[in-house]
UniProtKB/Swiss-Prot annotation:
UniProt key word NAD: yes
Catalysed transformations (reactions): a plastoquinone + NADH + (n+1) H(+)(in) = a plastoquinol + NAD(+) + n H(+)(out); a plastoquinone + NADPH + (n+1) H(+)(in) = a plastoquinol + NADP(+) + n H(+)(out)
Superkingdom per UniProt: Eukaryota
Top EC class for this record: translocase
Any one cellular-component term (Gene Ontology): chloroplast thylakoid membrane
GO biological process assignments: photosynthesis, light reaction
Cell compartments where the protein resides: Plastid, Chloroplast thylakoid membrane
Keywords linked to the UniProt accession: Chloroplast, Membrane, NAD, NADP, Plastid, Plastoquinone, Quinone, Thylakoid, Translocase, Transport
Function: NDH shuttles electrons from NAD(P)H:plastoquinone, via FMN and iron-sulfur (Fe-S) centers, to quinones in the photosynthetic chain and possibly in a chloroplast respiratory chain. The immediate electron acceptor for the enzyme in this species is believed to be plastoquinone. Couples the redox reaction to proton translocation, and thus conserves the redox energy in a proton gradient.
Protein name: NAD(P)H-quinone oxidoreductase subunit J, chloroplastic
Length: 159
């Protein structure tokens, strides 16, 4: 599989990762261990990836792992096509913990909270990690593949 500059740099510095290739737009995608994510995030920020374009999370498979996906952009003045990279950080379902990058990219605040609320990934050192869409009393993580929908019905007016 073809590797990009970031994957080659990580290999050179003996950082464990897995190259997942390139997407349809030519953006390199890497798989990173949760324990390495905070240091790699700092490296990316220092290199110039100063914008967290988006963050999301998904359930890989029932009984499997959860993934937190970060799309980072290197924005520079006068550059029409900024560099982008996609980082996937995987965590086991029984203890889904990933270091928060809120302290590096402030835009991770609500995005990591939404991932916590919907998928149940706990972002270590996030300053306000609590539910953002569901009520605090909600039980479970609605976007997990093993989620069981509560047995209740919405009452509607017949007007």
């Amino acid at each position: 599989m073809q590797q990009g500059w970031l994957s080659n740099w990580l290999v050179k510095h003996k950082v464990v990762h897995r190259s997942l290739g390139f997407d349809h737009r030519g953006i390199e995608t890497l798989q990173i261990k949760a324990g390495d994510w905070d240091s790699i995030a700092v490296i990316l920020y220092v290199y110039g990836y100063n914008y967290l374009r988006s963050q999301c999370a998904y359930d890989v498979a029932p009984g499997g792992s959860l993934a937190s996906v970060y799309h980072l952009t290197r924005i520079q003045y006068g550059i029409d096509n900024p560099e982008e990279v996609c980082i996937k950080v995987f965590a086991q379902k029984d203890n889904p913990r990933i270091p928060s990058v809120f302290w590096i990219w402030r835009s991770a605040d609500f995005q990591e909270r939404e991932s916590y609320d919907m998928v149940g990934i706990s972002y270590d050192n996030h300053p306000r990690l609590k539910r953002i869409l569901m009520p605090e009393s909600w039980v479970g993580w609605p976007l997990r593949k093993d989620y069981i929908t509560p047995n209740f019905y919405e009452i509607q007016d017949a007007h």
